[in-house]
Amino acid sequence: MNQLRKIIESAFEKKEYISNNNIDSTVNNAVREIMDRLDNGTLRISEKINGTWITHQWLKKAIMLAFHTMDNQLITWGGGVFFDKFPMKFSGWDHTRFENKKLRIIPPATVRYGAYIADNTVIMPSYINLGAYIDVGTMIDTWATVGSCAQIGKYVHLSGGVGIGGVLEPIQTNPTIIEDNCFIGSRSEIVEGVIVEKGAVISMGVFIGQSTKIYDRASGNIYYGRVPAGSVVIPGSLPSKDGRVNTYCAVIVKTVDSKTKNKVKINNLLRDI
């Protein structure tokens, strides 16, 4: 692993001079190995280590190098013809492979090579970009978008039209993270490396970026960049200092209780394949 990282870090420093015509075979092999391992989940962009999310920026650099070094190719998919450097993730998969992974992929769901999809997931017609990580038992609902390198936990439900922000550049920026057992309501947007902690419920139409105030009405605390575990969040507003206008915020109205869980619970029958 350290050797792979050294190869990528060194090559990235001179990425402007690297192309598919002059790439060193050692670098090329390293980039392709990393893309394969992101695709199969043995590497991931960000992971929780000792309670803290750690982003492996060198893996993002490997993806950027892949854009420099991989050739565009014709992609025939869904009755159309496309032209890109990265194939569709499920190109070449057969019945047995889908069945063994216990996946349901509903057309025209689009998943790019380099995104990891864990077992027992349901992917409705949606878009999942490269470098993303979708963990076990999650449902990505219709027209949801999971951006590059976003990390989605176990048993998450991304409702219809949800947008989860992606990030490749700037390199030092962290991905958006949705932890285990979260529910993200329809048409909500979580972007800019925000972390939604375990078990949180986001109502429909909530927009959260790094500068969004997340107001806890019980305590009066204001959070930025993270939604505390178990929070139930709705859209709201707060008055300006002079009281002349109200500006948008997200409001924590309570913590998750049994009533909330029943409202957002995904019927296991929908997952039974």
Curated annotation (Swiss-Prot):
Alphabetical list of InterPro entries matching this protein: DapD_Trfase_Hexpep_rpt_fam, Hexapep, Hexapep_transf_CS, THP_succinylTrfase_dom1, THP_succinylTrfase_N_sf, Trimer_LpxA-like_sf
Principal place of residence: cytoplasm
Record-level Gene Ontology MF annotations: 2,3,4,5-tetrahydropyridine-2,6-dicarboxylate N-succinyltransferase activity; nucleotidyltransferase activity
GO BP field: diaminopimelate biosynthetic process; lysine biosynthetic process via diaminopimelate
Annotated Pfam families: Hexapep_2, THDPS_N_2
Superkingdom to which the source organism belongs: Bacteria
Localisation per UniProt entry: Cytoplasm
Binding site for substrate: 104, 141
Keywords of this entry: Acyltransferase, Amino-acid biosynthesis, Cytoplasm, Diaminopimelate biosynthesis, Lysine biosynthesis, Repeat, Transferase
Keyword Disulfide bond annotated: no
GO CC field: cytoplasm
EC number: 2.3.1.117
Catalysis: reaction(s): (S)-2,3,4,5-tetrahydrodipicolinate + succinyl-CoA + H2O = (S)-2-succinylamino-6-oxoheptanedioate + CoA
Principal EC category: transferase
Oligomer status and interactors: Homotrimer.
Protein name listed in UniProt: 2,3,4,5-tetrahydropyridine-2,6-dicarboxylate N-succinyltransferase
